Amino acid sequence: MDTSKRTLPLFVAGTAVAGLLILLGLGSEQAIAHKRPHTAEELKVFNDVFMEYVVLGDKLFHGDAKAQEELGVTLSKTGMACAMCHPSNVDVHPNEFPKYQEQMQEFATLRDMINWCIEKPNQGEPIDSDSEAMKALEAYIYWSSRGSPLAPGTH
């Protein structure tokens, strides 16, 4: 059966719909993947906010009780901090996530692994994946591992 006669009209119709959607999106207020390069001022704001989270994450990673209290989290009930098992952020490998995580026996994200460490070895209370504490820990861990090539799914 020759399907080329049916395929061409479908292709043309699909292309027309895609073009129309693009045109409709261009007139909206919604930004479409950086229409223009960011200004130096914008980049400074972005970096300053990121580094605020990195500094907070560093405090949490190293067991700062005041930072935990301010955020309402309990990362450990054993007196352990993330840095005790991962000095200088060693053996964290955020560039490998998501992946199958042997300790958890499931496919996991970095946030899943952070909570696993909080709950299991540290006997702390899991933190919400969208919380400021989680964002800060994640920012610090990624920042500490900058330069590592992305390798999701590897060990």
Functional labels for PLM-detected ranges:
Residues 3-16:
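Bacterial N-terminal signal peptides that target proteins for export
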Residues 34-74, 122-123, 155:
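Electrostatic cytochrome c docking/interface patches
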Residues 103-115:
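Short microdomains enriched in Cys/His and/or Lys/Arg
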